Amino acid sequence: MKSYLNLKEEVWDRETCSGCGACVSVCPTENIYFKQQSPVQFDCDECACIIVPTENGESPISAEFCKVTLYDVNCGACYNACPRTKERHIFNLEKVPGRVIENYKAKSTLETKNIQSGGVVTAILANAFDEDLIDGAIVMMEDKWTMDPKSYLATSKEDVLKTAGSRYNWNVPILEVLKEAVMVKKLNKIAVVGTPCVINAVYQMMATNNDLVEPFKKAIRLKISLFCFETFDYDKMLKKLKEVEVNPWDIKKMEIDKGKLIVSTIHGNVFDFKIDEMDEYVRKGCKVCRDFTGISSDISVGNVGTPEGYSTVLIRNKWGKGFFDRTVINGYVSVEGEASIDPVISLSKKKMERKDIEF
């Protein structure tokens, strides 16, 4: 019988946690937290429950409420939802960039401020809400002043438009709001937008036969992956930016291009940092990820292979095609032929060179 202890041994202690938040959401006893959400922020001297995480810990922690370890009750939900365990279901990564039935160079026609890289994801979600194809979307919300990221549950088109422009350069446990969506708000047509590790966690949920995960897998309707080579620790990156006197509210755009992290400010200044020299700012869990595009998604979107202001859109199955086609037909997205797929393949192969997790 699996418990969080198996997850801790195989993932947390080995520093391969992706930080996706899946384990937090599916835990029925709310036993698992990331340090920012810990219900107790001090060491407990009255019992053995010291649940304050280490200062630089990137993995979740246990509040010692696990029903497997306390009462020998069958669970294992957290283990079965994790994309980094020994028993994870691995989508075939060898053929990059995965199954693609159609690819497009596209951009949103929505008149919305701050839209990033063509705004196609925002447009797909906005149309899906308008047509009642979804009743919720799990996305990232970014404070426009501090750039502090958080998981956000959008329940309307207006909510989605508020998140436009949020940068997924920061790691945030996006799936942590899945429990609220499914168990509290009883949503059952949910879209999930995230980096490949997040989408791979959803794939784990879809593949498991654990009854406790069943409500979550049934509620997810659409998976949209964003191209990602790696994400950065928010606190560490802010310190790095302060070294070059860049405040978070001055940042207009952050992107990775040609081996560099490029930061553009509202004042017209551009700073670039070599990715090879940014290792200490990258989440440790990112270093074992080999998926650049989110192969297990329905739709993958990024800005590689298209010019400024456009998105590269990879349609992976008929399900994703249905959502995208309706978005185009309804005038939310403009398509201008195919994207250049070679740069996507090149970066996918480069990321595949990383060493896989070994047990």
Where are these regions (language model features)?
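Non-catalytic accessory regions outside enzyme or core folds
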Residues: 2, 9-12, 18, 22, ...
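Iron-sulfur cluster-binding cysteine motifs and their immediate structural context
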Residues: 2-5, 9-12, 22-96, 294, ...
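Short loop/turn hinge sites at secondary-structure boundaries
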Residues: 15, 70, 184-185
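Alpha-helical architecture
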Residues: 19, 46, 195-196
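Catalytic cores of large soluble enzymes that bind and process phosphate-bearing ligands
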Residues: 19, 70, 74, 112-117
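Iron-sulfur-associated redox domains of electron-transfer enzymes in respiratory
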Residues: 83-359
